[in-house]
Each structure stands twice: as C-alpha cells, then as structure tokens.
C-alpha cells in the first residue's frame, strides 16, 4: 500500500516539509536500521531526486547530479532504499500490458516523493519561482497527481503504475484494480497540451491487446484547469481538485 495512507511520516502541511527534512537528516534515517549515513550525501540525493522528479532518471543520473565526488552506485542505491523505507521516496513502477505488436516496454520506475512538498522544500522553490519555471512546476504537479491517485487507488484496493515504450508513447499513470480493470491517465498542467495528450491516450489504448487485457475503463487527462468534461472522442478531462474515490 502507498505510504500516503495511514502514515504519520507523510507531510501534508507544506510549511512542515523543511523541518521534516532537517529532522530526517539529524536522526530519523538512522532509526530505520541503526546504520549511520553520510548526511551530506543524503541531503544531496534528496535534492537530486527533487530535480529529477517525475522522470525515469537512473541511479547513475541521480549520482552524477550530486555535487563533488559522488558515492558509488551501490551506496546511492542503499541510500535511496533507506529513504524509500523512511517514506520520503515512492517510485512509480512500470506497467507491462500485453500489446498487439512486439513493442519493447520500458521498465524503469518514475522518480517520486511520497509527498511532493518535500521536493519543493529540497529545491527551495517558492510560488514565484515555480511560476517562472513551468517545466519544474509541471513535473511537481505531475507528482502531486500521482500522490492523489495513489491515495484514492489504495482506498479502492488498486495500484498505480506508469507506461512508456521504446517509441516514447506513454501514460503518466495507469490505474489498475485487482480484478484487472484499468484506466490510462496523462497529466497536463495547462489546457494547451490537452489535445495532444488525448490523442496520445487514444493511440496507446489502440496498441493494447484488448482480447487479453480488456478495454481501458476510461482515458483521462488530469489537469490544473478548472473544468471537467468529456470530449467528443470519449476522453475525460478533469482538474485534479475534482478527484474522489
């Protein structure tokens, strides 16, 4: 189950995030398994994760993004595992459906925080800075959407994945229930990319082997806009604030 449900480790008050990171580095992380870790490396890994949020950055990329001489890949992996167990990171695993063609599906996870406010704190981002950097804002918004989708899917007994294949056809989120039903989701902060996102979802849906996997229950473009509606092509467009289990 997602660490977002029933865990006091997860932060819901944005103002708490910087203090939480400080407390984590000071003591909490050592309580996971009793091992003492390099606080400088830990802080740099958190910042690197924040800079690579909502991407499929490899551990090598995470390490290369650190300042100074980075630790070994094995050390980075161990630190990431500790931060995952501490409910700081919560990567999104890849979905592997049966496709009509033999398209290679990527298996790398998408990097996410359990609560995106921790990423905002690690970046030192402010509302004004985010308004001036829509690329970062969009990636953080995507992670916010993943957090909420995970919360609702936990309540429904389902899981959230992501999909990307070698042609770069993707779904930012794939919602999967225990009975096999699924839905495809793209996340877009504004309204301009909605048409392209809807076309992308339709294309992906057509590639899935419906005889084995079934048809998608719905296709959804999740946005930061204000209005929910169903397009003529059947794709649902809905603001994040409208979600409910």
Regions found by a protein language model. Name each.
Residues 3-10:
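Short, small-residue-biased leader/transition segments that mark boundaries at the very start
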Residues 15-181:
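Accessory nucleic acid-recognition modules appended to NTPase machines
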Residues 121, 194-195, 228-232:
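Switch/connector loops and helix/strand junctions flanking conserved nucleotide-binding motifs
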Residues 164, 221-223:
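Short beta-strand/turn micro-motifs composed of small residues
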Residues 181-193:
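Active-site ExK catalytic segment of metal-dependent nucleases
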Residues 184, 220-221:
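Structural beta-sheet core signal
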Residues 224-245:
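Domain-level recognition of nuclease-like catalytic cores that cleave nucleotide substrates
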